[in-house]
Amino acid sequence: MAKPQHGNISSNHKKKALTACVSSLICLGVSHAALAAHPTITPQTLHALTVLPDNEKLRIGDRISQVEDDINRLLPQLTLKEKVSLVHAAGKFHIPAIERLGIHEMWMSDGPHGVRYEIDRNSWAPAGWTNDYSTYLPPLTAIAASWDLNMATLHGNVLGAEARHRNKDLILGPGVNLARLPLYGRNFEYMGEDPFLAASLVVPEIKAIQANDVGATVKHYALNTQELNRTKVNAKPDERTLREVYLPAFEAAVKQANVHAIMGAYNEFRGTNANQSKHLVNTILKGEWGFQGVLLTDWNVDINTYDAAMNGLDIEMGTDVADFDDYFMAKPLLEMLNAGKVPVSVLDDKVRRILRVQLSIGMMDKHRLSGERNTQAHRDDARTLAANGIVLLKNDNKVLPLHADKLKHVLVLGPNADKRHGFGGGSSEVKALYEISPLAGLKAKLGDKVDIQLMRPASSQFMPIPNDYLTTRHWTGTPSWQINYYNDNKMTQLASESWIADPQFNAKGQKQFVDIKANIKPIETGSHSFNIKADGQVALYINDTQLIASTQANQGHVISKAMTLTAGETYAVSLRYQGDKQATLGWETPNSLYNTEQEYLAAAKKADAVIYFGGLSHADDRESIDRPDMVLPGQQDEVIAKLLKVNPNTVVFMIGGSAVEMPWADNAKAVVWGWYGGMEAGNAYADMLLGNQNPSGKMPITLPKKLTDTAPIALNDYNATESVYSEGVFIGYRWFEQQNIAPLFAFGHGLSYSQFDYSNIRLSSADIANNDMTNDDIAGNDTITVTVDVTNTSKVDGAEVVQLYLHDVKASVPRPAKELKGFDKLWLKAGETKTASFTLTQRDLSFWDVNTNNWLAESGQFEVMIGASVADIRLRKRFDYQHKAKP
């Protein structure tokens, strides 16, 4: 059976933890002064930044100093079979115990933004627990948008504390793959497109997780930048691109945060699976970086026993093989060990690493922390995190903030107005006690004094069945459609099950056999027309009776069939689809749920404020698929354009984890990007819209005007077989700068209700000199400090993210026009001036030299650029660097 839940943390243990917390701020780089200047951190949320430092862990059982001694004591007592049992799964999410030695089962959980609901011990089915709810935090894109190390700490601490309370040993996050492709289905899980930003934020995130006696698992190592054929696509970047762009966040996780675990990627790397790549694992990760933790696979990876064992894989996790002893790292490994094909010393190294992790997080320590979960403080933290990630993209004529005392009637529209997102996205889905929708947040904020009207614009094109009528519930309690995937066209061999928010499916060019089903309950009696728009073979069943016979559908033609439904009765609806394209199920009710164009435009003209909550959902942003394009789903562009024409002050509030095209952007006065905001999203959005929270987020990704402006598409380097990363080091904004392409909204862009002035840039020296670096030398032997004064020239308190970009003026290799090398978030009262400070190291000046296989900073001039975004540079200054070769 699954492990029991922890009860409430004891008062004695809590007192001990809180006492230890007093000194932890400095250890995590969060000073008391920084907290005092941070307006969104209150006494109620302060606890989440005060996590146990390493010196407190030493005090509790003197754990860290004993780890290696305990490993040396335990390892010789293990039999060969016991050692092998530890390097592969014994269930869907755990490796086994060796109870005679006090080695317990090590349990893992998905959850980069909330601990996932409990999975059955040996299958993918939900365990059906009633006490596995967790706090649903904003995903890491929102944390990246905060550009705030404190927010990464806050996020990591809540995640770690809740994982510990759920009795988990490893949390499978954070993710640090870069947003190379806007279509990538998992961009929302990661930290944006820039290697420096991701590397900077992942360190405090990991430290905070692990301070809770839980191991963080950084993923996916490496180059998992598309879901299209993700288990087979061959990533083939050149070495310089690999080192400068796609590895720095992993390197920081190892060297600066001492992360306990790393999860390998699904994809191949230069012809072999990334989990068994000698170059990635033994040479770089465990060799150059000195990683002491464990490398574990993702679930269902394509490896072989010998290469995986010899090239550094430590744990093979879940597959579809029924018998865990048949895993590649189980019986086949034992046979190779007995035959002498794999040395026992190789296995011993893996077991040492596993024991090191278990001992380091206190799995054999009676003083191990117990954590806490679903507390009011954690809900406050979720709201704080959501608020700090909101990005104000456009605010002409100061349309925002809205003034509550001037509002009598507010019109709310858009597919995300009352949608909840926590249950979707794939492995990152969270079972939360509740989730505040944007509509609910506005109603809670404005109360009964303001009339808030929700309207659903009808489209001139096809509309899916809305979830208002669903009685089927995802186990999180959210109205949802179940989707079953089959291996055969007779649809008898079930492959997997999942859930989607709407009855629409995109096979992304891969032949699929799916059954999309839910129970619906009409609210009126009469003729209901079921409509199917698809490319492929479709059939529709109502209560297991075929309403639309199996037929070949064409996307240009809608197949319709009407039947009489009775109000209050439940009907089982099943859409079966076979094909490699798309299918959507819609309907028309006797009195349509949707408002006509005439109705919603008339309401928009009269309203005191119009807010359109659009964007994406986890039907679009989710694991296992990429989007087909950057177009907003559901004809949103059409509706937004019409709203802006009749009411130019319409606020367009986008929710989603990846870039979308916005052809109406020039006509919009107010555009906001809110990401997926977690369980407190609606409250945080309302705070920002009504001026109770001054937006301070900045874009961690570039928002292109069109998909063809992006490097992978422009260079035809996005396909199912291989990606050579043709753009090289010119990822994201670097590509746009190099190609002189104007984006829709630039990397680092984000407005405030305040205004800020930059002045007085200063360098600690006009020139620096340095010697050759080794692979282990990050900082070099000298640094240069850059400072700049920032003044809040407005009458509104606010925060500004000051960004430092660097350029090697004359380099021997192509280098970006701007590379992010520093950022500093300043909280400024109205009229206040503060100084932003940055330290540049030799590594910051360097590129990866393929000739010497090392970092190289060339002599010459470097230009420092200080700005509010990559496209809004306010100050510039140059310095000289002199490289001195070692004698």
Model regions and ranges:
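Acidic/polar hotspots within intrinsically disordered regions
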Residues: H6, N775-D776
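Gram-negative bacterial Sec-dependent N-terminal signal peptides
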Residues: M1-L35
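Glycoside hydrolase catalytic-domain context in secreted enzymes
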Residues: A37-I768, D772, I778-F847, N854-L856, ...
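Short beta-strand elements
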Residues: D872-P887
